[in-house]
Amino acid sequence: MANKFVITWDNMQMYTRQLAEQLLPADQWKGILAVSRGGLVPAAILARELNIRHVDTVCISSYDHDHQRDMTVVKAMEGDGEGFIIIDDLVDSGDTAVKLREMYPKGKLVTVCAKPAGVHLVDAYVVDIPQDTWIEQPWDMAVTYVDPIAKK
């Protein structure tokens, strides 16, 4: 993927707060199920904004930094997801979302970002991303010193 969409920490907080507004009223939720690892940061923000204390994880491995690979369920929460917000950072091809729907058919599946191939699988999201675009998440980047242009 040649195109990149960079999400800063500030943007992630802003987008996730917008997502939280779509999930009101907060008292309808028993808890949040974060899809590890991409959903961990958004889950923390949702937990704060919706004042939800019960946060669990489902660990599904399908990416290795910049490419997809076989999906493995490492850890799962018991139950059908009823009353839970299931949060991931992104729905891309939809493979992870399909698995989550199978595991938690009564949960509310939400993502911060959505690509066209998987957008129909989520109940709510905030940012549309073109299919051929790679997302750089803030936890995958570091702030580094850059020489002034005049020194180059």
Curated annotation (Swiss-Prot):
One of its GO terms (cellular component) is cytosol. Its EC number is 2.4.2.-, 2.4.2.22. It is found in: Cell inner membrane. Mg(2+) binds at residue 89. It catalyses: GMP + diphosphate = guanine + 5-phospho-alpha-D-ribose 1-diphosphate; XMP + diphosphate = xanthine + 5-phospho-alpha-D-ribose 1-diphosphate; IMP + diphosphate = hypoxanthine + 5-phospho-alpha-D-ribose 1-diphosphate. Purine salvage pathway enzyme that catalyzes the transfer of the ribosyl-5-phosphate group from 5-phospho-alpha-D-ribose 1-diphosphate (PRPP) to the N9 position of the 6-oxopurines guanine and xanthine to form the corresponding ribonucleotides GMP (guanosine 5'-monophosphate) and XMP (xanthosine 5'-monophosphate), with the release of PPi. To a lesser extent, also acts on hypoxanthine. It comes from Aliivibrio fischeri (strain ATCC 700601 / ES114). HAMAP family: XGPRT. It is an enzyme of class 2 (transferase). It is a peripheral membrane protein. This is Xanthine-guanine phosphoribosyltransferase. Pathway: Purine metabolism; GMP biosynthesis via salvage pathway; GMP from guanine: step 1/1; Purine metabolism; XMP biosynthesis via salvage pathway; XMP from xanthine: step 1/1. PANTHER family: XANTHINE PHOSPHORIBOSYLTRANSFERASE (PTHR39563), XANTHINE-GUANINE PHOSPHORIBOSYLTRANSFERASE (PTHR39563:SF1). Homotetramer. The lineage of its organism: Bacteria, Pseudomonadati, Pseudomonadota, Gammaproteobacteria, Vibrionales. The keyword Transferase applies.
